[in-house]
Amino acid sequence: MQFLARNLVRRVSRTQVVSRNAYSTQTVRDIGQPTPASHPHLMAEGEVTPGIRIEEYIGRRKKLVELLPENSLAIISSAPVKMMTDVVPYTFRQDADYLYLTGCQQPGGVAVLSDERGLCMFMPESTPKDIAWEGEVAGVDAASEVFKADQAYPISKLPEILSDMIRHSSKVFHNVQSASQRYTNLDDFQNSASLGKVKTLSSLTHELRLIKSPAELKLMRESASIACQGLLKTMLHSKGFPDEGILSAQVEYECRVRGAQRMAFNPVVGGGSNASVIHYSRNDQRIKDGDLVLMDMGCELHGYVSDLTRTWPPCGKFSSVQEELYDLILQTNKECIKQCKPGTTIRQLNTYSTELLCDGLMKMGILKSRRLYHQLNPTSIGHYLGMDVHDSSAVGYDRPLQPGFVITIEPGVYIPSSFDCPERFQGIGIRIEDDVLITETGYEVLTGSMPKEIKHIETLLNNHCHDNSARTSPVSLCKVKGLHTNRNPRRLF
């Protein structure tokens, strides 16, 4: 079993490890994001972003143009830089539609797509001072040479050129969430909006993003693999470090050293009754001996995310009550995955999961009436997954699944401590979540390598050999260093 655990956490592909020997003395042009020349350990020739070739980006733009009504244009703005304080920015993450269509990972740009002009990109202009403080950015040359824009202009030209394009268009599509005042303040845009000519672009782009290409699926499998390895490694160390904050930090570390650029979202690490809070994110409490911990996490790899949840007892043993409730969630997870196939809808899967969970909760005496079920689980069984965690949100859950869709299956029960049920069940939250690819014949569980069977989890936790550092608990570290044990042990790490 120790061999199995080692094998599970060591399955790291070449894309998950940055080679320390890949370097060149040749001068490489910096465009503010990785290129095959600057990052040969990440990218092959012909790729605009790791794993995605220029031909795929051009194909995406062609498909979007085909969806646009005649004489229409689409305006796609890069994501804005969001500030933590007046001079400290939050880590930048690109708008998914802008990245999907251009491959540009940087802020400050606006892309315009139409049948007549093709892709027109308005790019940020940097001064020597900007470059000294923040480095190079992709400009007009990169737009033409790297992103293969049909036309490229500095952003200062946008008011003049885009106004003319809007005046001669019957409809204008854009995304409200990422809209930039660079164009929304233009008189011609506002006139079109007042005439009802401005439409939401996400209704079109989210359709395109639903079905993943082979290249996208390769990245999603890799992202899921990293998440599984990171979560398993964290689970194995939770016995020595039963602390929400430490486990949150560790899972991010484990994912990033395997190649992930960031977490897909702030991890949910809920110990004990905190697990009954669906999107709990404080992650600031010690986990009591005998309590369960629910960890909902995912990572992002080159623009594609994973989303994975497991619930386990850091002490290494499920209690009989925990096991009874966990088994209900596990069986619901497995039965719903079996129903994943072309033609099924997420709404149908949700109805099926509700029936299974209601039946089980009624038998256990937790529910006195089916009408109370949504107090214990107000969520859907799952959602679409891709470049965003809740991907293609403009597409409803009545859409029949097709090969190439990726969805989550995440049944759960969240019982508040105040809920009117047998006391032994109060304050327990359990969720088991997997990422599922819809195939021609059924499904593929992308997160299938992450253990979820009770006996498997218990055996892994109890047979895992900690190294000397992991064998020492935070409290004992306090004692060794002569510190008071009522101090926050995380200050030591």
UniProtKB/Swiss-Prot annotation:
Supply the alphabetized keyword list: Aminopeptidase, Hydrolase, Manganese, Metal-binding, Metalloprotease, Mitochondrion, Nucleus, Protease, Transit peptide
- Transferase as a keyword of this entry, yes or no, is no
Pfam families registered for this protein in UniProt: AMP_N (PF05195), Peptidase_M24 (PF00557)
GO molecular-function terms, A-Z:
aminopeptidase activity; manganese ion binding; metalloaminopeptidase activity; peptidase activity
InterPro entries from the UniProt entry: Aminopep_P_N, Creatin/AminoP/Spt16_N, Creatinase/aminopeptidase-like, Pept_M24, Pept_M24_MAP, X-Pro_dipept-like
Q: Summarize what gene deletion causes.
A: No visible phenotype. Altered mitochondrial protein stability.
Example GO biological process term?
A: proteolysis
Q: How is the cofactor bound?
A: Binds 2 manganese ions per subunit.
* EC identifiers of the protein: 3.4.11.-
Segment annotated as transit peptide? 1-19
Q: Which Gene3D superfamilies match?
A: Creatinase/methionine aminopeptidase superfamily, Creatinase/prolidase N-terminal domain
Q: Which cofactor does it need?
A: Mn(2+)
Residues involved in Mn(2+) 1 binding: D307, H383, E410, E433
- Record's GO cellular component terms: mitochondrion; nucleus
Task: Specify which residues bind Mn(2+) 2 according to the UniProt entry for this protein.
Answer: D296, D307, E433
Q: What does this protein do?
A: Aminopeptidase which cleaves preprotein intermediates that carry destabilizing N-ter amino acid residues after the mitochondrial processing peptidase (MPP) cleavage site and is thus critical for stabilization of the mitochondrial proteome.
Q: Which family does it belong to?
A: Belongs to the peptidase M24B family.
The protein here is known as Intermediate cleaving peptidase 55, mitochondrial
For this protein's source organism, the top of the classification is:
Eukaryota, Viridiplantae, Streptophyta, Embryophyta, Tracheophyta
Which gene does this sequence derive from? ICP55
